[in-house]
């Protein structure tokens, strides 16, 4: 008997899917218009979906997945409220209905969150079930092959434990990294400005509310758990088995302990969502052997999750696709099979990027980074210039020994790939070289293409993923031990550096507290503070790095870029601690007033700072 194309459950999924789209769209006209187009396409796709009524009912009936979807939708509903509460268009709609906007928007958010639960739950249920089915099959194949090693569950615990030990010095430092200070003081999120709506939603779940309380070290430990899961999944995807050797676990630690990701895990608030962007780039590849629609959809959702959590990870998925395509070709897969895999991956990638660009991304242009592209004629030269700048930074960041180990790890990847290939030697060498070049160009994602990009270490953790791919390939199996050594050595030096970096943060924190207390102590002697009248205090200059760290950059140039400015003028992030953490009486922080151009008399001058002031104005010049 022929299955009916339409049945009530499909209609429910259509309406629920549209509700989910409305829950995610930001308050801007272009996004809302494209959201309507996406809703029509979604309904057509669900209509044509070749699935039975019984299958849909089974997917909808799992209570755990339904609860998970409701929790996630609830976090999105909080986003929806903040996005639309000040919208004039929403206020007009509320007025037409005779309601106050303060009541109408929460009702809409709650309605869309509940209405979107069936669609979200159905998708979650399908992919969890498919993943479990593939895992059971891979586990059975691993047992039949006689492969021995550390099971996935135990491997995950080991990798997580190693990662947490690796960042223990960072956790012990209790360092407020860059915008951690204002977030801890004010509890704000404000990732929406960079269209990182998923980070905002997940933060609501992690912190148990809309106000971000300082829950460190929980977010950082959660970040390392996510990175450990990402590493194990990468090994599972590439090796196609459920057991791992000690060599393989050692090189997988590079993923979370490379110096560039240490710049991410230093954040007390942002760390889990930076780590989640890596996981979102890896998970779609679990379904690469599923039907085309399922793989393209999960790839699109994964890239959308990357772009709405931390866009620096946008190059990880295509980089892994290229590496997997090389493995497929080397193992004898036809050009057609490899090409089809790449095309499906590219389709999913484009789907996610297009939805993000047309519906979600609100143009941003700041001194930090923008999302505009240069002109078409300048795009490729601009990309190559920025790419060269990224690799120049890596060369200066890495010690000579690190550079040697990284080059040897890349060479081991190439040698292992060619030796294990079922193809002829020359074509294998050529394809490996092409793959190496492509992965090197992709590891920084879309950032090299941006007209105004960012070169901070936290934006470069894709290079750590590239090193992990090198090491994972070289360390695979039980043979050719010499090829495993460079990546294992690299994992060890990164492990050691994580302690050095954490201790350096602790030293910088102590020095910052010392210098801040000196300024406050001297300000107490200023006559302007002997009354209750407000006094405008401005900071200029910077304390720089702690003296004990001055010699370290000769050995670890990476520290120069990882340790931020902590106390000084000209940057809000270096002033929040001074103005907000010490309950300074009568002190006014007024960024609109610049005292540096005034010829204020010197009130105090010592080896650490100069204090100038007159009347209700005080300028602190840090040395």
Predicted features along the sequence, with ranges:
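Start-transfer (signal-anchor) and selected internal transmembrane alpha helices
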Residues: 7-15, 57-69, 104-165
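Transmembrane catalytic cores of multi-pass membrane glycosyltransferases
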Residues: 19-21, 29, 33-36, 75-97, ...
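Transmembrane alpha-helices and membrane-interface helical segments
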Residues: 41-48, 115-122, 232-236, 283-287, ...
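Signature aromatic-anchored transmembrane alpha helix within multi-pass, membrane-resident enzymes
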Residues: 65-66, 72, 476-499
């Amino acid at each position: 008997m022929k299955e009916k194309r339409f049945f009530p459950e499909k209609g429910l999924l259509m309406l629920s899917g549209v509700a989910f789209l409305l829950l995610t769209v930001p308050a801007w006209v272009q996004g809302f218009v494209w959201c309507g187009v996406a809703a029509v396409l979604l309904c057509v796709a669900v209509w044509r979906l070749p699935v039975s009524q019984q299958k849909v009912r089974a997917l909808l009936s799992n209570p755990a997945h339904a609860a998970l979807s409701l929790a996630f939708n609830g976090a999105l509903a909080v986003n929806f409220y903040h996005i639309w509460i000040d919208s004039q268009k929403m206020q007009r709609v509320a007025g037409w209905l005779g309601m106050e906007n303060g009541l109408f928007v929460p009702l809409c958010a709650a309605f869309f969150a509940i209405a979107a639960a069936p669609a979200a739950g159905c998708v979650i249920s399908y992919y969890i079930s498919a993943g479990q089915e593939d895992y059971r099959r891979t586990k059975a194949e691993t047992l039949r092959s006689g492969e021995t090693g550390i099971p996935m569950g135990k491997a995950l615990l080991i990798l997580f434990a190693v990662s947490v030990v690796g960042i223990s010095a960072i956790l012990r430092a209790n360092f407020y990294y860059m915008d951690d200070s204002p977030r801890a003081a004010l509890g704000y999120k404000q990732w929406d400005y960079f269209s990182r709506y998923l980070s905002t939603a997940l933060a609501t779940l992690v912190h148990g509310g809309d106000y971000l309380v300082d829950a460190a070290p929980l977010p950082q430990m959660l970040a390392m758990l996510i990175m450990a899961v990402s590493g194990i999944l990468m090994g599972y995807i590439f090796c196609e088995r459920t057991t791992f050797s000690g060599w393989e676990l050692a090189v997988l630690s590079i993923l979370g302990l490379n110096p560039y990701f240490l710049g991410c895990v230093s954040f007390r608030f942002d760390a889990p969502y930076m780590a989640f962007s890596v996981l979102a780039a890896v998970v779609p590849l679990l379904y690469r052997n599923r039907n085309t629609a399922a793989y393209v959809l999960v790839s699109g959702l994964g890239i959308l999750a990357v772009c709405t959590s931390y866009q620096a990870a946008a190059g990880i998925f295509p980089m892994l696709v290229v590496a997997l395509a090389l493995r497929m070709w080397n193992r004898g897969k036809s050009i057609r099979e490899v090409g089809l895999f790449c095309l499906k991956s590219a389709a999913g990638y484009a789907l996610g990027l297009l939805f993000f660009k047309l519906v979600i991304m609100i143009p941003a242009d700041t001194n930090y980074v923008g999302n505009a592209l240069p002109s078409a004629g300048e795009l490729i030269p601009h990309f190559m210039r920025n790419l060269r700048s990224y690799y120049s930074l890596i060369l200066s960041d890495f010690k000579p020994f690190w550079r040697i180990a990284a080059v040897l790890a890349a060479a081991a990847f190439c040698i292992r790939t060619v030796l294990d290939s079922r193809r002829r030697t020359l074509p294998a060498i050529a394809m490996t070289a092409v793959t190496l070049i492509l992965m090197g160009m992709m590891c920084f994602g879309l950032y090299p293409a941006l007209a105004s990009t960012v070169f901070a270490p936290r934006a470069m953790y894709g290079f750590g993923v590239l090193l992990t791919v090198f090491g994972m390939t070289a360390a695979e199996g039980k043979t050719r031990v010499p090829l495993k050594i460079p990546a294992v050595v690299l994992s060890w030096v990164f492990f050691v550096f994580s302690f050095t970096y954490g201790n350096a943060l602790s030293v910088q924190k102590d020095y910052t507290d010392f210098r801040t207390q000196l300024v406050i102590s001297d300000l107490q002697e200023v006559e302007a503070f002997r009354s209750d009248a407000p006094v405008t205090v401005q900071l200029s200059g910077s304390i720089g790095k702690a003296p004990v760290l001055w010699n370290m950059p000769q050995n670890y140039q990476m520290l120069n870029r990882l340790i931020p400015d902590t106390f000084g003028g000209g940057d809000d992030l270096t002033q929040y601690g001074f103005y907000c953490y010490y309950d300074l009486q009568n002190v006014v922080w007024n960024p609109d007033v610049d005292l540096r151009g005034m010829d204020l008399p010197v009130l105090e001058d010592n080896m650490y700072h100069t204090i100038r002031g007159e009347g209700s104005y005080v300028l602190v010049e840090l040395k």
